[in-house]
Design a protein with these regions (language model features):
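Loop-centered beta-sheet repeat module
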Residues: 122-168
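Extreme N-terminal starter segment of soluble prokaryotic enzymes
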Residues: 1-3
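Conserved N-proximal alpha/beta basic substrate-recognition cap immediately N-terminal to
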Residues: 7-23, 28-133
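A long amphipathic alpha-helix within ATP-dependent nucleotide-binding catalytic cores
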Residues: 187, 195, 207, 223-270, ...
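Short acidic-glycine loop/turn motifs at beta-strand connectors
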Residues: 44-45, 53-54, 207-211, 265-268
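Phosphate-binding site of ATP-dependent enzymes
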Residues: 20, 151-245
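Peripheral (often C-terminal) accessory segments that flank ATP-dependent C-N-forming ligase machineries
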Residues: 304-341
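A short beta-strand motif that forms the metal-chelation/ATP-contact edge
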Residues: 205-207, 268-283
Length: 341
């Protein structure tokens, strides 16, 4: 059995579960949105039973791999209004869930600890180290530094957050002169500021174990391609040099799955923008026909042989931030060298 930690409302979870079922491999979607709202979990003597609100039940101890598809926000009863109580309950759920997952000692896609470690600050640093081009980047909460940065790039600057705002999608935005008026709020929390890359071609890369799928689209002047769901996508043939460096980045970060955003500048060079260990791929698959779902099923059931050969090993020469990873199958999956077309 494959455990998919997500939500029953998540199309990605349902589609991959269906692909696994077609192969005769059962999958159980553990709905983390039901924590505090109908889910029942019990661990005893090596068994872990998970019951969903719809009555479906599974013994998670029989799991052969876990896809940590989505983080969770417990759906607590509004009557639990005290912030301290809610935070205490959230921590209880967090320890129970991830402690139980690590105790399984099976392949994790991706290890939840490593997913958290793959922050924008770390991934930008690691991308530079392995030779990927990265736009000039400033991460700061200092207004004067931002103004100097904007002046240096003659106003051609974009800005984005380091993380998400709960369940909201926060898009990357182009610097506007009026943004200077809001810099007094920057003291509260840092943000990312980058030079705006010239060029209108963006490549969405999906890495699944050894396989790499790339799709190109025209941004049509938009700063954040995610804002245009109707943009036409076409299969893109990445240069082998870029493929090798993306694989190296995945290995250094200890990730088996991620989506990567690249921008092609006016000279045809590829620039690394960001990586998402839980990025979406269905819209790319639907528009291009790339078999990403099948690749994910292969990875989870173990047909990605190179990934299995890397079981129980930390990434080669990992960044220091990953060396404190907790015990468990923290690096069973690593990227290899096959380019899927």
């Amino acid at each position: 059995m494959i455990l998919i930690i997500s939500s029953l409302l998540d199309r990605h979870a349902r589609v991959v579960a269906h692909a696994l079922a077609r192969r005769g491999v059962p999958a159980f979607i553990g709905d983390v949105m039901e924590f505090g709202a109908g889910a029942r979990l019990s661990a005893r003597n090596g068994d872990l039973h998970w019951s969903r609100a719809d009555g479906a039940t599974a013994n998670i101890a029989q799991t052969r791999a876990v896809w940590c598809r989505r983080n969770f926000t417990p759906n607590f009863d509004p009557a639990m209004s005290d912030p301290c109580d809610r935070e205490f309950a959230r921590r209880q759920w967090t320890e129970f869930l991830w402690g139980s997952v690590y105790a399984l000692d099976v392949a994790l896609v991706n290890d939840p600890y490593l997913q958290q470690a793959a922050t924008k600050t770390l991934q930008l640093s690691e991308a530079r180290k392995i030779g990927l081009r990265v736009p000039d980047t400033l991460i700061t909460n200092q207004a004067s530094a931002v103004l100097d940065f904007v002046e240096r790039h003659r106003g051609r600057v974009i800005h984005k957050t380091l993380g998400t705002a709960m369940d909201q999608t926060l898009f990357t935005k182009r610097w506007d002169g009026r943004d200077a008026e809001a810099l007094n709020c920057l003291d509260l929390a840092p943000m990312i500021f980058q030079e705006q890359v010239r060029g209108h071609r963006e490549v969405r890369v999906t890495v699944v174990g050894e396989a790499i799928f790339a799709a190109e689209f025209d941004t049509c002047g938009k700063i954040d391609g995610r804002a245009d769901v109707d943009a036409p996508y076409r299969v893109h043939d990445l240069p082998q040099e870029v493929v090798d460096r993306l694989q190296a980045l995945m290995t250094r970060l200890g990730l088996a799955y991620a989506t990567v955003d690249l921008r092609i500048d006016g000279e045809g060079d590829y620039l690394f923008l960001e990586l998402n260990p839980q990025g979406q791929f269905l819209y790319v698959e639907i528009k291009t026909g790339l078999p990403i779902t099948e690749a994910m099923a292969d990875l989870l059931i173990g047909e990605d042989s190179e990934a299995h050969r890397s079981a129980h090993r930390m990434p080669a020469d990992p960044p220091a931030a990953l060396l404190a990873a907790p015990r468990g199958d923290t690096s069973r999956w690593s990227a290899g060298s096959r380019l899927a077309s």
